[in-house]
């Protein structure tokens, strides 16, 4: 099993944390508001601990469960405290009208995180194509991208421990397109599907 630290105390932190505890992983919760972190840790149970904001995380895998515009600044703020860790960015940088990405260049939040993280840190993009309520109700495919092979093995094993299927889409540059998939998911929720209780996945056909 894995040891993870959740930076953030919102809905996605709660959803991932719940599955992580159920999967037998060691979980730490960290938030700017210590009382919210304490409350989430107690709600998750399973020996979940509370960390100190900015301190070295307990988890080998650090999940930044934050709004997109806070991810890069927080990673920069943590600095060397994240050395040797695997950072998992789950954010979606949607624009204000939810019909485009907030950045115009062919980049991603995960790629920008890699620029400010310590050189010994690996960055993986994952979970951004899944709505919180889907994690609570179902077992969707989890697309992920990253450059470090061992980091992807570790993240894949963690995803599997949640009862989900990890699907590797390639190097970290693919994180840009995963963010685009997140946007497509929102478009489907508002149009073709018409509700939020679904997830994108892969169906394989033989013969």
Label the predicted regions.
Residues 1-43:
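NAD(P)+-binding Rossmann beta1-loop-alpha1 motif at the extreme N-terminus of oxidoreductases
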Residues 5-6, 64, 144:
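Hydrophobic Val/Ile/Leu positions in short beta-strands of Rossmann-like dinucleotide-binding domains
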Residues 15, 19, 116, 158:
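Rossmann-fold NAD(P)-dependent oxidoreductase module
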Residues 38, 76, 111, 115:
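Active-site phosphate/pyrophosphate- and oxyanion-stabilizing loops and adjacent acidic/basic residues
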Residues 41, 45-86, 90-97:
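Rossmann-like NAD(P)-binding element
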Residues 91-133:
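Rossmann-fold NAD(P)-binding glycine/threonine-rich loop
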Residues 141-207:
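Active-site-lining helix/loop region of Rossmann-like oxidoreductase modules
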């Amino acid at each position: 099993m894995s040891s993870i630290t959740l930076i953030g105390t919102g809905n996605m932190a709660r959803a991932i944390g719940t599955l992580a505890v159920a999967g037998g992983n060691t979980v730490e919760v960290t938030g700017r508001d210590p009382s919210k972190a304490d409350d989430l840790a107690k709600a998750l149970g399973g020996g979940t601990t509370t960390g100190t904001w900015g301190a070295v995380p307990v988890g080998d895998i650090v999940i930044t469960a934050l709004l997109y515009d806070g991810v890069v600044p927080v990673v920069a703020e943590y600095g060397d405290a994240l050395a040797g860790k695997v950072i998992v960015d789950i954010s979606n940088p949607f624009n204000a009208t939810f019909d485009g990405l907030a950045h115009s260049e062919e980049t991603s939040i995960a790629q920008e995180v890699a620029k400010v993280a310590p050189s010994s840190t690996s960055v993986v993009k994952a979970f951004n194509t899944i709505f919180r309520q889907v994690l609570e109700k179902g077992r969707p495919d989890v697309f992920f991208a990253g450059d470090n092979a061992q980091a992807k093995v570790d993240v894949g094993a963690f995803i599997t421990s949640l009862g989900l299927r990890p699907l590797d889409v390639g190097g970290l540059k693919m994180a840009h397109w995963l963010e685009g998939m997140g946007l497509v998911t929102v478009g489907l929720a508002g149009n073709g599907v018409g509700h939020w209780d679904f997830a994108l996945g892969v169906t394989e056909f033989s013969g």
